Amino acid sequence: MTIKNKMLLGALLLVTSAAWAAPATAGSTNTSGISKYELSSFIADFKHFKPGDTVPEMYRTDEYNIKQWQLRNLPAPDAGTHWTYMGGAYVLISDTDGKIIKAYDGEIFYHR
């Protein structure tokens, strides 16, 4: 490897690592631009789901209740709702009957 190639590789690594090292603001969720992750439907457990559908009982248990929604870049759940995870999607459901309110692609986790 020539010195020119080594310098080019070093510069490339420096630029890409600096982009990934940008700190997120502590205690806040960056909700700008998250609409691109919103899903009109998704598949979980070999079944097609959309807002208005009722999720299976298993996803209403405390084990599936996402309490640290900020770490996943999700908006705060409204009163009477909570986030759960189904088949690669984050799903906002009502506490009382498990109706799907909203769903986001799991890639929202990496949103900056």
Curated annotation (Swiss-Prot):
Q: Which residues form a coiled coil?
A: none
One cellular-component annotation, GO: outer membrane-bounded periplasmic space
Write out the GO biological process terms. DNA damage response; response to cobalt ion; response to nickel cation; response to peptide
Keyword annotations of the record? Periplasm, Signal
Q: Where is the signal peptide?
A: 1-25
One family from Pfam that matches here is RcnB
InterPro entries per UniProt:
RcnB (IPR024572)
Phenotype seen when the gene is deleted: Mutants show reduced intracellular nickel or cobalt levels.
Q: What induces it?
A: Repressed by RcnR. Induced by nickel and cobalt.
> Into which family does the record put it?
Belongs to the RcnB family.
Reported function = Influences nickel and cobalt homeostasis. May act by modulating RcnA-mediated export of these ions to avoid excess efflux. Not involved in nickel import and does not bind nickel or cobalt ions directly.
State the protein's name.
Nickel/cobalt homeostasis protein RcnB
Protein species of origin? Escherichia coli (strain K12)
Upper classification of the organism: Bacteria, Pseudomonadati, Pseudomonadota, Gammaproteobacteria, Enterobacterales
Q: Which gene encodes it?
A: rcnB
